Amino acid sequence: DCNVPRCTTGKYLKERPSFTLDPAPHAGAYYVQEAASMFIEQAYRKISADFTPERLLDLCAAPGGKSTLWRSLLPDGALLVANEPMRQRAEILAENLTKWGHPDVIVTNAYPNEFSGCCGMFDVIATDVPCSGEGMFRKDEGAVTEWSPANVVTCADRQWSILCDIWPCLRTGGYLVYSTCTYNRLENEEMVARICKELGAEIRSEEH
């Protein structure tokens, strides 16, 4: 086993064991996720160099892997709001964060526009938005059959709607962390450019 370069607590495994037979993840001792998801620690280092976040919203949080990492990085006393719009997925999110065991977490089941009363409330908003899933091709044949150029456009439209709904909830000088699990420019580089142009954001870093 070896360390994930961008995450001090992440480990690569040489082979995939049967996690369901290991009591440790069921007790919240560790969480299994793709190494790519662990970019969060790199993002947090950039943020914490400017200020220490007190309130972070993980907007599309289920099943909870990124939320566990955000919560591990945040200081004690900071609040993580882990949200999932889909009810069944929100229940899974709540279960995983309950296992993780940190008290300063609130799990919500709301659509982005339902946060309209939280104007300027959050120091950081993490948006791992629903996408066309091109990053899933290597392990999910269904993702390949579901993909189409039209679906890419549909996903980009949905992402923009989500961003417009949630943008007012970010305080002045706060950070929006935008991520997808897809590769096309429309949902990534072009979306980030649109966020900057139409919402007035500034790119903090272009490091990859």
Regions found by a protein language model. Give the residues of each.
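S-adenosylmethionine
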Residues: 1-207
